[in-house]
Amino acid sequence: MTQISERLLVQAHLDAKQPKPLTAEEEAFYRREIAAELKKQNAVLVAHYYCDPVIQALAEETGGCVSDSLEMARFGNQHPAQTVVVAGVKFMGETAKILNPEKRVLMPTLEATCSLDLGCPVDEFSAFCDQHPERTVVVYANTSAAVKARADWVVTSSCALEIVESLMDNGETIIWAPDKHLGNYIQRETGADMLLWDGACIVHEEFKSKQLLDMKALYPDAAILVHPESPQSVVELADAVGSTSQLIKAAQTLPNSTFIVATDRGIFYKMQQLCPDKTFIEAPTAGNGAACRSCAHCPWMAMNTLERVLTGLRQGSGEIHVDPALIPKAIKPLKRMLDFTQAARMKVAGNA
C-alpha cells in the first residue's frame, strides 16, 4: 500500500485550501443567510463533532443535528427534510445518500475525504476479501460506498464492539477494515478472530504515549479520554476509551474536573457546552507546531466552512451521487447496523 505517500500528497493539496478567518459581521451574515436557505429549501444541516464550532452551532440553531457518524446516519434517515446538508467528510454524505436515495444530499465540499477511506481502495480490498471467503466482512463507516457494498456489516466506533461480540458469539471469523488501531482494540477487548486491514487516521495516529505521559505529569488529577483509533500505547493510558459520543458522556459522568482529550479538537465544542465547569486539554500530537501533520484537527473536516455551506445551498453544488447499482448492496450492511443498534437501545430501555 502507498498510504504514507498518499497522505503527504493530500496534505500538500489541502495546505493550499485553508479557509480565511471571517469577521464577526461576516460570520453573522453567513449564519443568517444559511438559516434562511435551509428553511426555504426544506433542508436540514447535520454536522459531525469534528467540524469547526461555528458549523456545529449553526446545525443546532437551525434544528439540525450534531453527533457522531452513527447518529448522523440515523437522523438523516428519519428527518422529513427533502435536502440533507452533511457537514463532515465524503463517506458521511455517501452514507446519507445510500440510506435516502430519494433525497438530495449536499456537502459543503466534495473534496473533504478521509485518510481511512483513501487507504482502503475497493479493488485491493475486494481482492483481500476474496482470499478469505469464509470470513464475515466488517467495515468501519469511514469507507467508500463501494467498500460498504462489499461488506457484510458496517459499524461505527460507538457500536463496533457490540456487533463484533455478537458475530463472535455466532462463531464467525472476521475481516476488519480499514482502521488497524480500532481493529486491534476490538480484537483485544473481544478476543475475536480478526484479520486487520492496514489503515489509520492521520489525526489519531499522531498521538503518542510519551507525550501523553508528560502531559499527565503536568495534570496528575486529569482523566485521559482516548478514541480507539489511537495507537495501542495511547489507549492503554486512558481512563475512558470510546467513540466521540461515548467520550462526551465520559466527560459528563466522570468526577474529574480536568480532562486530557486524545481525539480531534472539534469535540471540545460539545464537551464545553455540556460541561462548562470542566477543563479540557488537547492531548499532544507527535509533532509540535508546523511539524505535526494534523495538529489534532482533521484537515478535511476543517474544509466545511460557512461560505461553502451557503454556496452549496444556493448553487446546488457539492451534491452527492452514488452509483445506483451500489445502493442495494451498500444499504444491506448499513441497515444491519441500524437495526442492531435500535434493538440494543430498545433492550436497554426495557431493562431501565
From Swiss-Prot:
GO molecular function, one term: metal ion binding
InterPro entries, sorted: NadA (IPR003473), NadA_sf (IPR036094), Quinolinate_synth_A_type1 (IPR023513)
Domain of life: Bacteria
E.C. no: 2.5.1.72
SUPFAM superfamilies, sorted: NadA-like
GO (cellular component) term, any one: cytosol
Cofactor(s) essential for the protein: [4Fe-4S] cluster
Gene3D superfamilies: NadA-like (3.40.50.10800)
Keywords noted in UniProt: 4Fe-4S, Cytoplasm, Iron, Iron-sulfur, Metal-binding, Pyridine nucleotide biosynthesis, Transferase
Catalytically driven reaction(s): iminosuccinate + dihydroxyacetone phosphate = quinolinate + phosphate + 2 H2O + H(+)
Principal subcellular localization: cytoplasm
Pfam families reported for this sequence: NadA
Cofactor note: Binds 1 [4Fe-4S] cluster per subunit.
Localisation per UniProt entry: Cytoplasm
Presence of the UniProt keyword Iron-sulfur in the record: yes
Pathway: Cofactor biosynthesis; NAD(+) biosynthesis; quinolinate from iminoaspartate: step 1/1
UniProt-annotated binding residues for iminosuccinate: 48, 69, 140-142, 157, 227-229, 244
Binding residue positions for [4Fe-4S] cluster: 114, 201, 298
GO biological process: 'de novo' NAD biosynthetic process from L-aspartate
Stated family: Belongs to the quinolinate synthase family. Type 1 subfamily.
Function: Catalyzes the condensation of iminoaspartate with dihydroxyacetone phosphate to form quinolinate.
Protein name, entry field: Quinolinate synthase
Organism: Ectopseudomonas mendocina (strain ymp) (Pseudomonas mendocina)
